[in-house]
Amino acid sequence: RTTLHRLNFRDVSALVEHARAMALDGISFLAADTVTSAFGRSAAGGAHADLALAPCDVAEFAEVIEALLATHADDVQSGFILESPARLRRLPQYYAALAGLDAYPEVACNAPEVSIVIEADGTVRPCFFHAPIGSLRQAPLQRLVHEQLTAFRRTWNPDTDVICGRCVCSLRTSWRSAPWH
């Protein structure tokens, strides 16, 4: 996945061309998560907060996405660009919401129902963006899944969850159509 942010959003078309030149099977895009503690960082700001688009860049990003859809329509149609036009258009809307200019895009996600995240240090999360439910250094995975993950899933409601409402990654899948197939 390619994370689009303040420093590279204008280069999205060039990123597609680079992916082709590298003979990759495809390319996928995601907005930068600047608000959670995902990926081993503090949620209290820091360097990752600087990745958000400035309010004055949001309209330009929307234009960049529309240009991408026009110039790379074949790549979208063939699936080389993995996102649909609607999902690509969510990217500038996400940054608009982050800047207080719009509502966050609707999220339809079930990642915590079909996957878990195990970080390099053994931390286990229900998805990349939610708080840890435990650590492999303190409990075996089977116990974490059967106890802590089950407890998380019982109380989790993606329609009202604050983390889900501001999530950059709206994953809706099933075991039969999982992204790794």
Task: Go through each PLM region and give its residues.
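Flexible mid-to-C-terminal extensions adjoining Fe-S/redox cofactors in radical SAM and related proteins
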Residues: 103-110, 117, 121-181
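Radical SAM enzyme [4Fe-4S]-AdoMet core and its adjacent flexible, acidic
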Residues: 1-110, 120, 131
